[in-house]
Regions:
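A generic structural signal for residues embedded in beta-strands
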Residues: 56-57, 75, 99, 133, ...
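Solvent-exposed loop/turn segments at secondary-structure junctions
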Residues: 62, 80, 97, 139-140
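Acidic, glycine-rich loop-and-strand cores that form catalytic or ligand-binding grooves
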Residues: 90-107
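Protein maturation boundaries and topogenic segments
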Residues: 1-86, 104-105, 148-192
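Short, surface-exposed loop/helix-turn segments at secondary-structure junctions
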Residues: 109-118
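Soluble extracytoplasmic domains of inner/organellar membrane proteins
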Residues: 119-165
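Residue-level recognition of short, solvent-exposed, well-ordered loop/turn junctions
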Residues: 48-51, 68-69, 92, 126-127, ...
Length: 192
């Protein structure tokens, strides 16, 4: 005997209900708990590959809650809010920051720039509620040197791990590593 219309209707509603619940759960997890995204760009070399690494991001650090100097964060790009970027926090509120350490010599400044930038070094204080972020690969990074201090409200999460599935099952030391998974720890040391 063929199922009646009420059985098909019940099946449709049950399936739709579970699909909607699953979609809501996935949305909540990605928005508020955890997300995983592929890297694109060379600004974080050598910590992360330009392409093919997947970063694991904890959302409990959203809006800058609990972030520290040296943490890797995912944030909305200040010049394009629809884009996400990965950067390292190199200055916290109240810190005095050398804007561009890579250009702190007389070889990189023209005579006119030397006059307007107080010699070779230009320092700024990170305002309250902001952080200073830079890429690990300074020569290929668009970061706070370009768009100044970033509001903590743009921070979407903290990167805690990465993996490189394209590299196979062994890391650089020829040791087994599931999809080249690695924890990314904060390696900042305070020299003061």
């Amino acid at each position: 005997m063929a199922p009646g219309p009420s059985n098909w209707l019940r099946f449709f509603w049950t399936t739709s209900s579970w699909a909607l619940r699953t979609a809501c759960a996935v949305h909540v997890i990605k928005a508020d708990i955890y997300d995983c995204n592929e890297t694109r760009g060379e600004s974080m070399l050598t910590t992360l590959q330009a392409y093919g690494d997947y970063v694991h991001e904890l959302k409990k650090y959203k809006l800058g809650r609990g972030v520290e100097m040296g943490d890797l964060v995912v944030m909305s790009k200040p010049t394009d809010p629809d884009s996400r970027v990965c950067k390292r926090i190199t200055g916290m509120p109240g810190d005095m920051i050398l804007v561009d350490p890579s250009s702190s010599s007389e070889l990189t400044y023209s005579p006119r720039d030397r006059e307007t930038n107080e010699g070779f070094n230009r320092f700024v204080e990170v305002p309250k509620g902001h952080v200073w972020v830079t890429g690990d690969n300074l020569c290929l990074s668009m970061d706070s040197r370009s768009f100044q201090a970033v509001p903590m409200g743009l921070i979407k999460g903290k990167i805690v791990a990465a993996n490189s599935p394209m590299k196979g099952f062994f890391n650089e030391d020829e040791k087994f590593s599931f999809l080249n998974f690695k924890w990314l720890e904060n390696n900042f040391t305070d020299d003061s």
